[in-house]
Design a protein with these regions (language model features):
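Short, solvent-exposed loop/turn segments at the edges of secondary structure
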Residues: 13, 91, 113, 161-163, ...
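Extracellular beta-rich repeat passengers
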Residues: 119, 124, 134-269
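Right-handed parallel beta-helix
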Residues: 1-102
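Extracellular beta-strand scaffolds
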Residues: 1-3, 24-25, 56, 61, ...
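WD40 beta-propeller repeat blades
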Residues: 67-72, 77-81, 87-92, 97-113, ...
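Intrinsically disordered, low-complexity Ser/Thr- and acidic-rich flexible linkers and loops
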Residues: 128-130
């Protein structure tokens, strides 16, 4: 099953499972359906799983799911956002916004996007800046990031994020100044925290051995809105028991198994 032509919105859903589907909106309706068409997006979701799906050819983000709780996005291909699609902001091909409390993003292939590879979007259900809002805890592990343009993973306000054991491989579209950037941590006006460890940077053994040498800090390090760099992983029931391999060992399985593989991959994947 392939959904095309329009974005797919799963916001405010609960007890949701999506498996073995393809989402490729394209740009044919960019001027009639709104120019911010994600292949799939949702916020304020509760108890959800997105597994073995393929997402591409969007005019805004490819996959965005944030400000929810108790979810997993795994074994998906998130690829080929449309950089020049007719979006009102011009060049606009992004990977996605990942977030939510007690949410795991694991074993995904995130490839060929200029930025938001992904962006970490913080907070739980509702607005984290208002009464009842809170800081989310999430994990990105064993993902393969390939051929980012001018930014890798960044953001992270109102979130405590484990960014661990991911495989990063720059490509022909990667700008030289971010070629070996593992992550850009924090937002200056929002509190948050990161645990970054075990990530493999293809072509740079020094950064593979010490991820701090490939990490940038865009948050502030003092005051109420500081971004904390943790020496130990953050914990949450949803991912504490997840099986996480080394970054080097996740590369081949993700390439072989990610995406809508049942009954077989299409020609795009």
């Amino acid at each position: 099953i392939t959904l095309s032509g329009w974005d797919t919105n799963i916001s405010n859903s609960e007890n949701l499972i999506i498996r073995y589907m393809r989402f490729r909106p394209g740009a044919a309706n960019v001027h009639t359906g709104g120019d911010s068409m994600d292949a799939l997006w949702g916020r304020d979701n509760k108890t959800f799983m997105i597994d073995h799906c393929s997402f591409s050819w969007n005019t805004d983000e490819t996959v965005s799911t944030y400000r929810g709780q108790d979810g997993t996005v795994q074994w998906c291909i998130v690829s080929e956002s449309l950089t020049v699609s007719g979006h009102s902001k011009g060049r606009h091909g992004y990977g996605g916004i990942f977030g939510g409390d007690n949410v795991l993003f694991q074993n995904n292939l995130i490839a060929n996007h200029t930025s938001r590879n992904p962006r970490i979007g913080g907070g739980c259900m509702g607005d984290p800046t208002k009464d009842g809002g809170s800081t989310a805890t999430l994990q990105l592990s064993n993902n393969v990031l390939y051929n980012w343009g001018y930014n890798t993973c960044y953001g992270g306000g109102y979130a405590y994020t484990n960014f661990i054991n991911n495989f990063l491989k720059p490509g022909q579209g990667t700008r030289e100044q971010v070629r070996y950037q593992v992550i850009d941590m924090g937002e200056a006006t929002k509190p948050g925290g990161f645990y970054v460890n075990g990530n493999y940077m293809d072509g740079n053994a020094e950064i593979t051995a010490d991820n701090a040498k490939g990490s940038k800090m865009s948050g502030v390090t003092e005051g109420a809105n500081k971004t904390v760099v943790s020496e130990t992983p953050y914990t949450a029931e949803g991912f504490d028991s997840a099986t996480v391999t080394s970054a080097a060992d996740c590369y081949e399985p993700v390439l072989a198994q990610a995406g809508a593989t049942y009954p077989y991959r299409d020609a795009i994947d």
